[in-house]
Swiss-Prot record:
Alphabetical UniProt keywords: Cell membrane, Flavoprotein, FMN, Membrane, Oxidoreductase, Pyrimidine biosynthesis
GO biological process: 'de novo' pyrimidine nucleobase biosynthetic process; 'de novo' UMP biosynthetic process
Record organism: Sulfurimonas denitrificans (strain ATCC 33889 / DSM 1251) (Thiomicrospira denitrificans (strain ATCC 33889 / DSM 1251))
Gene designation: pyrD
Broad enzyme group: oxidoreductase
HAMAP family documented for this protein: DHO_dh_type2 (MF_00225)
Its job: Catalyzes the conversion of dihydroorotate to orotate with quinone as electron acceptor.
Protein name stated in the entry: Dihydroorotate dehydrogenase (quinone)
Cofactor list: FMN
Amino acid sequence: MINYQSIKPWLFKLEPEDAHMLAEAALRIPNVCQVAFNPFLESHFITNSILKQELFGRTFFNPIGLGAGFDKNATMIRAMQILGFGFTEIGTITPKAQAGNPKPRMFRHIEEQSIQNAMGFNNEGLLSAQKRLKKRFPFTTPIGINIGKNKLTPDTQAINDYTTLIKALHELGDYLVINISSPNTPGLRDLQNEEFITKLFEESKAITSKPILLKIAPDMSKEDAVALTKLAVLKGADGIIATNTTVDYSLVKEPKSIGGLSGAVLKEKSFEIFEAVAKELYGKTTLISVGGISSAKEVYRRIKAGASLVQIYSGLIYEGPDLIKNINNELTELIKADGYTNITQAIGADRK
């Protein structure tokens, strides 16, 4: 197996989006010859019972998931299991295919181990995602589907985009995620308000009993984050994902003027919002933490703060395909060291 750190300098000479497309091409190979990757699956997909838990009616063999935005079109689901992820969140999917924002729209901040992206929900649309999901359904590991509105859809009609997606996709995933927190679709974050949240969840829960989660932005006060998430849960949200990328450009030395920051610079900002939400909602709903996570120590910090699951994206780019295996092995030891026999005992330990 090729050592990732030896090829990373070469990959990083490519434009970030070109490198991603190259990685996607490689990660689509298991779709046609999965058996060739069985040795990698056996070594990287950790099945230690200490990490196993039941959520959303499914078994999660470990708590590490792929964050939305990496597999936009449901082309790499099999590969993510081979890399060791306990679950995968695809998307963001919009009703109609859209090209996203003009290029260049993805940038590396290598010194800060971070990514800045202004992709703009580029994806092949609902019909394409639906076709791929149907072809591979049911899935060995849980699948989340992240959904968003089209750029040209007026805010007054945004709910129609979300309900259209829910109707078409709810039977093809294990949970759905309402994305109104990306900074790359004009006006999208303005939908993080009481009126829209109330109507959205009322209509969505009338369509399906499948879990529907809300993903929030980090660029709001703790008080606003708590108020928004409490309202969402009251209106029917089955979980909260905190957080999306940040537009706090002071976190990097040479920021671009567009897009959201992810990776190491987001770690503390995302944790602060997550912790504030967890203090109010731990034990009342399922909490998923994402933002700047790239080590077992940080995963365990989020778990003890109240996260049942965590998600990783930028860390995978900087650390490579062994990251998830290494985290799960180290996380197992951290849980054991605290005297627990299962991850569920550690979840929310700091809230008890």
